[in-house]
Amino acid sequence: MKRQRGVVLLLALVLSLLLGLLAASALRDALVETRMAGHLRDGLKALEQAEATLLAGEAQLQTAPPGLCQACLAPAHPHDLQGQWQASAEGFFQLQNLGISTRALHMPRGDLVTLYRVTAVSRQPESRQVLESIYAIPAAQTQAPQRILWRQRLRQD
């Protein structure tokens, strides 16, 4: 009889250990999912901030367009905010005048338009998002700027 009690005790301890390991594994999975959801939320918030900053840059473009730039390369490392950036409520943006073109996308061929690049960066440093748009403004300036190109820049770009 004593021997059976020892086996039952051992079996109960093994089952308790297995249940404890199962609970620890479930807790770890729940923590990982919580972290993933937090990162996703932060990324979406940063994307919203970058979109709002892009609109702020477009508004600045309508009121005070920049002069023609000499070296119109896109910012090399926009995630690091190196160079001249203008602050807005949701992030930072940079305006560049790319020059005049007669062959802008989605515009009547032959119409003179001035092309501008707006690069927008969200304020969140951990989940920073960078958006870049090219706008065309007709030479007659009777229309608002028209977005002709858009891209999201990743950290690897």
Describe each PLM feature range:
Residues 2-157:
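Terminal alpha-helical segments
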